[in-house]
């Protein structure tokens, strides 16, 4: 009789308890994944607001693919090695060459953004 009682009452009880524990695992996993994504979005918004408050201009719509395309379009075959000045040397030549390169890259970026 006790064996029959276990089959009728105990087995369904254990099946429900263990089955629901297994099923709740998936519901909780969805909750934790959603919380993680939401937290990352909040952190990203906080970072953007801090950067704009500090005066940095952020580009909108920047993706990994767009950055890869920019890097792939760079002319890496024709470049000039510029040695950085030492502490005892004059910085005027270095600053002049550096400014010329920055102006050239700024013009290229403006042309690409206008197209």
Curated annotation (Swiss-Prot):
Belongs to the COX16 family. It comes from Caenorhabditis elegans. Required for the assembly of the mitochondrial respiratory chain complex IV (CIV), also known as cytochrome c oxidase. The lineage of its organism: Eukaryota, Metazoa, Ecdysozoa, Nematoda, Chromadorea. Residues 30-115 are mitochondrial intermembrane. The chain crosses the membrane at residues 7-29. Pfam families: COX16. It is a single-pass membrane protein. Its main location: mitochondrion. The keyword Mitochondrion applies. This is Cytochrome c oxidase assembly protein COX16 homolog, mitochondrial. GO terms for cellular component: mitochondrial inner membrane. One of its GO terms (biological process) is mitochondrial cytochrome c oxidase assembly. The keyword Mitochondrion applies. It comes from the Eukaryota. Keywords: Membrane, Mitochondrion, Mitochondrion inner membrane, Transmembrane, Transmembrane helix. Residues 1-6 are mitochondrial matrix. It is found in: Mitochondrion inner membrane. InterPro entries: Cyt_c_Oxase_assmbl_COX16 (IPR020164).
